[in-house]
Amino acid sequence: IDEKVLKDYSKNWKKPSVAKDLFKYDKEDADTKVRMLFQPRGAQIEALYALEQTREDGATKGLVQAATGVGKTYLAAFDSVKFKRVLFVAHREEILKQAAESFRNVRNSDDYGFFMGEVKDTDKSLIFASVASLGKKEYLNNKYFEKDYFDYIVIDEFHHAVSSQYQNIIEYFTPKFLLGLTATPERMDSKNIYELCDYNVPFEIGLKE
C-alpha cells in the first residue's frame, strides 16, 4: 500500500457525528469529564484501509491477524462506525466490558447493552455478547434477534470460532460484514478457521512490524 494513499485515507477518515463531548460516569456522585476523542493510528490505519478495500471487492467476511498490543478491539470499533447495529462476541465478560468501553469511546454512543449471564439486552445498537449465552440455540431466533438485526459482527479470538457455539452464531446471523480478530490463527486440533472467513485475510501484522 502506497504511503501517500494511507496518509490521505487517514486524513479523510471521519467519525460519526458527536452530539456531546461530555459524558457522566455511571456513578451517582461522579463528576462530568471530557471524553477523549479517539482516532486510528499506525497499523490500525493500514488495517482500516485494507478492510474497506476488501468490502469494495465484495467480501462479506474477513480475518485480521494482529499481535497483542496492536489494538484489535479499537480497530474493530473504528471499522464499525459506518454500520448502524453491531454485535461483538467474546468468551469472557471482562473482554466484553473492555470492548464496550472502547466502542463507546470511538462511536460516542451510550446506546449499547450486554447479552450475558442474567442480562439479555436486545434493543440496542451495540450488543456485547458472551458466546456461552448467545451461542445457545434457544436465543438464536426472532424472539431475541432477527437474522439481519446486526449490520456488522465482530468475533474476538477468532481461533475459537470452530467451536459449536461460535458456529451457531455465525450460521444464524446475516450481517453485511463479519470481522474475525485473532493473534493466534493456528489451532492445535487442525480445524481450519480460515474457511470460516472465506479464506479472506485482508490484514496481518506482528507487534514488531
Annotate each PLM feature.
Residues 150-153, 157-159:
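Conserved Walker B
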Residues 86, 93-119:
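Conserved helix-turn-beta segment of the N-terminal RecA-like "Helicase ATP-binding" lobe
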Residues 68-70, 182:
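Conserved phosphate-coupling serine/threonine residues in phosphotransfer and NTP-handling enzymes
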Residues 159-209:
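Post-DEXD/H (motif II) to motif III coupling segment of the RecA-like Helicase ATP-binding lobe
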Residues 93-95, 120, 132-135, 159-160, ...:
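Conserved nucleotide-binding/hydrolysis micro-motifs of P-loop NTPases
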Residues 117-149, 163-168:
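Conserved helix/coil segment N-terminal to the catalytic DExD/H
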Residues 124, 150-151, 175, 197:
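Local beta-strand N-terminus motif with an aromatic residue
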Residues 1-67, 74-86, 101-105, 123, ...:
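ATP-dependent helicase/translocase motor core
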